[in-house]
Every structure is written in structure tokens, then in C-alpha cells.
A protein has these predicted regions:
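Extracellular beta-sheet/turn segments enriched in Thr/Pro/Gly and aliphatic residues
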Residues: 22, 102-126, 239-243
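Bacterial Sec-dependent N-terminal signal peptides
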Residues: 1-40
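Beta-strand-rich modules
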Residues: 192-219
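A short, solvent-exposed beta-strand micro-motif common in secreted/extracellular proteins
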Residues: 70, 80-96, 208
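Solvent-exposed loop/turn segments flanking beta-strands in beta-repeat/beta-sandwich domains
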Residues: 43-49, 145-169
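Structured interaction patches on ligand/partner-binding surfaces of diverse proteins
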Residues: 89-113, 213-232
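Short, ordered, surface-exposed loop/turn motifs in non-cytosolic proteins
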Residues: 30-32, 39-58, 149-152
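Short, acidic Ser/Thr/Gly-rich low-complexity loop/linker segments typical of extracellular
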Residues: 58-71
Length: 243
């Protein structure tokens, strides 16, 4: 009986040693690296250097600055899940959440390479709504004016809340290309219904100028998209009633 007990103990000790060994293999560190591709507020390519990539919440702080090729390396980070913050003067701050840093030959390489643009230089100076049949038309003027020689990018936000903004909204549009002034968004009644707005509902809207590259990302805490490159100079919210 004693021999059997000793054998069981030996097996248990052996299992513990194996478990500890596997944990030790995972608890380690390596580099996180990657590239950025930088643009102006349109589609013009610019120098990729000078963007700071920071590990959010790291103590002590961990960051790196991109070189002329847009390359950065964050050395010897312990394995885990991280949020990387990309920032540079003139650019909306971009965040990459849930970077899974695990055992990989050569460390963790960030893919795909983010294309990041500058803050929108244009701004919205007026925005009004009109209902025509089963359509809602949002007429938007910008400064400088959109034209064939000067492309402007626009995005609108909708809500039942009169305080609608780029951070408080129920619906956000795609990024529209404007080569005219004013630019008119046409929203069909069927689209509004698909957004959750029924006939007779008062809907509040707000329009912002954006960059071609929005530097947008999903905020996992709010479940909303964040649009860092919007020019926040814009008129107060307007409204319309769903036809």
C-alpha cells in the first residue's frame, strides 16, 4: 500500500513540474514591431517618420518613434494583450486594441499596416435638412468649399437625442467624397427605417468634415466607432421628421 502511495505522489510531483515548465515557457518577453503608412488629410503620401507608438497603461512607459520607413519596435514586452496608441502632431490619435502578444519567432509583428491620415483641414460652416417626398436631403457647405480641385470628405451622425455629436450618436454614415459646395446627402425613408427611425420620429443630425483616412477604431467599452480626424468645428445639431 505504501509503495502505491509513493508512486501516486511521484506522478503528482512530476505533473506539477511539467505544469510549471509550461508556464515558464509562456511567461516571457519579446518585441512588438510594425510599420505605419502616413498621409495628409487626403490621399497624398507623406513622410512616415516621427509617429510615436505607445503601449497604453505600461509602467514604466514604453514607446517607440517610427523611422523614415515607418518602422517601429517596442522591445522586450512581456507576453500579454496590449493596446497600442499611435500619435503625432497634426494627426488624430489612433488606437489598436487587443494586440495579442504571444510566443512567435521574431516577436509579434503588427498586420495589416495601418494607413493613418492628418486631421481634416476643411470645416463645416452650415448644414440644413429638407424632406422631399420619401427622401431627406442634408445640404452641407464647407470652408474651403469642395470642388473638383479641392476634395472634401464628410460624415454625418444621427440620433433621437438633440445633443447628437460624433461621440453621442445612434448611427454614423460612411465617409462621403464632396467635390461640390453645397454637398447634398440624400437619405431614403427605407434607410432611416433600417436605422431604427419610424415615420413621424424627430431625428437630430450633425455633420463633420473628415480626412480620407479617418484613423477610426472601435471603442470596446462603448461599442461605438471613434473618428479621430474629424474637424470638430461644425454648426449646432439640426433636425428633421421622418416622412
Amino acid at each position: 500500500m505504501r509503495i502505491i502511495a509513493l508512486l501516486v505522489l511521484a506522478v503528482a510531483v512530476s505533473a506539477c513540474v511539467k505544469d510549471k515548465s509550461s508556464i515558464d515557457e509562456v511567461v516571457g518577453s519579446d518585441n512588438i514591431s510594425g510599420y505605419v503608412s502616413l498621409y495628409d488629410d487626403g490621399v497624398g503620401k507623406v513622410d512616415d517618420s516621427g509617429m510615436t507608438v505607445t503601449v497604453e497603461g505600461a509602467t514604466p512607459a514604453v514607446s517607440a518613434v517610427t523611422d523614415a520607413k515607418g518602422y517601429f519596435i517596442l522591445p522586450e514586452l512581456r507576453y500579454g494583450t496590449y493596446t497600442l496608441v499611435y500619435s503625432k502632431a497634426g494627426y488624430g490619435t489612433y488606437k489598436r486594441h487587443n494586440v495579442d502578444h504571444t510566443v512567435e519567432l521574431g516577436g509579434t509583428f503588427i498586420t495589416p499596416t495601418p494607413s493613418l491620415g492628418q486631421l481634416a483641414k476643411a470645416s463645416v460652416v452650415s448644414a440644413s435638412a429638407s424632406v422631399v417626398g420619401s427622401e431627406v436631403k442634408l445640404s452641407v457647405s464647407t470652408s474651403p468649399a469642395g470642388s473638383m480641385a479641392n476634395t472634401v470628405y464628410l460624415r454625418f451622425f444621427l440620433s433621437k437625442n438633440k445633443e447628437v455629436s460624433s461621440t453621442t450618436y445612434m448611427y454614423h454614415s460612411a465617409n462621403y467624397i464632396s467635390n461640390m459646395n453645397p454637398f447634398v446627402f440624400t437619405i431614403q425613408k427605407s434607410e432611416l427605417e433600417s436605422f431604427g427611425y419610424t415615420a413621424g420620429t424627430t431625428v437630430y443630425f450633425r455633420v463633420y468634415a473628415d480626412g480620407f483616412w479617418s484613423n477610426d477604431y472601435l471603442n470596446p467599452e462603448t461599442g461605438r466607432m471613434v473618428f479621430p480626424n474629424l474637424n470638430l468645428t461644425t454648426p449646432a445639431p439640426g433636425s428633421f421628421v421622418v416622412p
